[in-house]
Amino acid sequence: MAMTQTENQTAPQQHIRIFDTTLRDGEQSPGVALNHAQKLEIAHTLARMGVDVIEAGFPIASPGDLEGVSRIAREVRGPVITALARANRADIEAAAKGVEAAEKSRIHTFIATSPIHMQKKLNLEPDAVIERAVEAVRLARQYVDDVEFSAEDATRSEWDFLSRIFKAAVEAGATTINVPDTVGYTTPEEMRKLFAYLKAKLPAHVILSSHCHDDLGMAVANSIAAAEGGARQIECTINGIGERAGNASLEEIVMAFHTRRDVYGYETGIRTRELYRASRLVSRLSGMPVQPNKAIVGDNAFAHESGIHQDGVIKARETYEIMNAELVGREAAVLVMGKHSGRAAFRKALTDLGYGDIPDDKVQHLFGRFKDLADRKGQIYAEDLRALVDARSDVPQTFSLEGFQITSGMNMMPVAFVRLHTPDGPVDATAHGDGPVEAAFQAISKITGISPTLESYRIQSVTRGDDALGEVSIHVRHGETQLNGTGVATDIVEASARAWIRVMNMIVAGMGKNKAITQMTP
């Protein structure tokens, strides 16, 4: 029976640990390629938001992954920093090296336990799988005191076997036991019963954890059901990104517990006002746009089109809104600046929006972009400033855009004239293309001498009105390296050119991503 609001006010809130795997499982999304600086920025955002555990990566995948995990371990304080490892010595030693500098470190090791995985992938008998799991946990405990063990494809495994392998892992030193719904197969009722079964079988001090995929659209519901069954850690990602259909969405889980604490009685410790900012950051850096109707962080999440709904909200917001937009960091379209605003007012506006930690040299660059935008738009809103800040470059500026001109029309080949600032000074180039954007790309590549392959191109409006800012997101391949670039401007071609130049600078700086290991993980 559900608790009433009055009952819940006196009942103690049980803490649910939030384990964020955006940087590991989320990055396994097709087309996502995060470099070290981008991963670090996301990790700092997660720490500021209050997550309990950050899964920083899969160190054995490549030297670049190992360095990315190590950098997060060195620089991010607050959350536990963990790294993933298969149940073998090489993986575990790489994970240990990756997290050795962390303030609080964990190794997360796993092996498959379902009959189909043991037979078809591992070619091992169940007892041999248990033996490997025990050896892996014991080895991990030689490096860290905090070890998480996962049974890959747990929800298609035999419950008795899960109980056996989890007991063996705990006896070997595992402190957290994770139950992944690796292929998104289970249902909430099955999940609740499975966790209740495991809770009864395992020692009380062990933390049970869920890791749900969204193949049937039930990842969030399954995660909540796991908590009802006894899970005290939930693994999830910002915006629900991840392999195939993605993972359980962090922001949806957190706000479900927050909004319906009268029913669940759980708290997460997440600073909810950071959710929208984190969502935008991950969307921009990953190149994966958030669908407009996505719960909590979608553009339409707090929009009301129906006249009846609009009238109700005007009279009393709670008639059709179960939470305040401000609670998740969404501001109303408030006018904050104009073209006559000065640098001090600009700095204050950034601080008010939560960007007070931006260094002075970056603020100076952003102020220049703001003045250019104010000359075009006149009135600048909070969402415009957010878009400018989100588009700031974290890449060394070998090349920068000084100007461009497009000649295009019906029944004529588009021509782009582009001028870039380079280490040798201003350089001009002209090129043709199938459209004005491709012509601009070709002209830029002429100047830089770099011609990557464009694999995807997306554009979306990030502010409102006829003079809205547009954000272009591109995914390119340069040899074996994958890169994402973004650009923001009121002009589509300019935004596209800025995204292409960003990719050029990333290539020069060696900031691409080479996905070396693609084996399925929990």
Curated annotation (Swiss-Prot):
<dbReference type="Pfam" id="PF08502">
    <property type="entry name" value="LeuA_dimer"/>
</dbReference>
<dbReference type="InterPro" id="IPR054691">
    <property type="entry name" value="LeuA/HCS_post-cat"/>
</dbReference>
<feature type="binding site">
    <location>
        <position position="25"/>
    </location>
    <ligand>
        <name>Mn(2+)</name>
    </ligand>
</feature>
<keyword id="KW-0432">Leucine biosynthesis</keyword>
<feature type="binding site">
    <location>
        <position position="247"/>
    </location>
    <ligand>
        <name>Mn(2+)</name>
    </ligand>
</feature>
<keyword id="KW-0464">Manganese</keyword>
<feature type="binding site">
    <location>
        <position position="213"/>
    </location>
    <ligand>
        <name>Mn(2+)</name>
    </ligand>
</feature>
<protein>
    <recommendedName>
        <fullName>2-isopropylmalate synthase</fullName>
        <ecNumber>2.3.3.13</ecNumber>
    </recommendedName>
</protein>
<dbReference type="InterPro" id="IPR050073">
    <property type="entry name" value="2-IPM_HCS-like"/>
</dbReference>
<keyword id="KW-0808">Transferase</keyword>
<dbReference type="Pfam" id="PF00682">
    <property type="entry name" value="HMGL-like"/>
</dbReference>
<feature type="binding site">
    <location>
        <position position="211"/>
    </location>
    <ligand>
        <name>Mn(2+)</name>
    </ligand>
</feature>
<dbReference type="InterPro" id="IPR002034">
    <property type="entry name" value="AIPM/Hcit_synth_CS"/>
</dbReference>
<dbReference type="Pfam" id="PF22617">
    <property type="entry name" value="HCS_D2"/>
</dbReference>
<comment type="pathway">
    <text>Amino-acid biosynthesis; L-leucine biosynthesis; L-leucine from 3-methyl-2-oxobutanoate: step 1/4.</text>
</comment>
<comment type="similarity">
    <text>Belongs to the alpha-IPM synthase/homocitrate synthase family. LeuA type 1 subfamily.</text>
</comment>
<keyword id="KW-0479">Metal-binding</keyword>
<dbReference type="GO" id="GO:0009098">
    <property type="term" value="P:L-leucine biosynthetic process"/>
</dbReference>
<dbReference type="InterPro" id="IPR013785">
    <property type="entry name" value="Aldolase_TIM"/>
</dbReference>
<keyword id="KW-0028">Amino-acid biosynthesis</keyword>
<keyword id="KW-0963">Cytoplasm</keyword>
<feature type="region of interest" description="Regulatory domain">
    <location>
        <begin position="400"/>
        <end position="522"/>
    </location>
</feature>
<comment type="function">
    <text>Catalyzes the condensation of the acetyl group of acetyl-CoA with 3-methyl-2-oxobutanoate (2-ketoisovalerate) to form 3-carboxy-3-hydroxy-4-methylpentanoate (2-isopropylmalate).</text>
</comment>
<dbReference type="GO" id="GO:0003852">
    <property type="term" value="F:2-isopropylmalate synthase activity"/>
</dbReference>
<comment type="subunit">
    <text>Homodimer.</text>
</comment>
<dbReference type="GO" id="GO:0005737">
    <property type="term" value="C:cytoplasm"/>
</dbReference>
<dbReference type="InterPro" id="IPR005671">
    <property type="entry name" value="LeuA_bact_synth"/>
</dbReference>
<dbReference type="InterPro" id="IPR013709">
    <property type="entry name" value="2-isopropylmalate_synth_dimer"/>
</dbReference>
<keyword id="KW-0100">Branched-chain amino acid biosynthesis</keyword>
<dbReference type="InterPro" id="IPR000891">
    <property type="entry name" value="PYR_CT"/>
</dbReference>
<dbReference type="InterPro" id="IPR036230">
    <property type="entry name" value="LeuA_allosteric_dom_sf"/>
</dbReference>
<dbReference type="GO" id="GO:0030145">
    <property type="term" value="F:manganese ion binding"/>
</dbReference>
<feature type="domain" description="Pyruvate carboxyltransferase">
    <location>
        <begin position="16"/>
        <end position="276"/>
    </location>
</feature>
<dbReference type="GO" id="GO:0003985">
    <property type="term" value="F:acetyl-CoA C-acetyltransferase activity"/>
</dbReference>
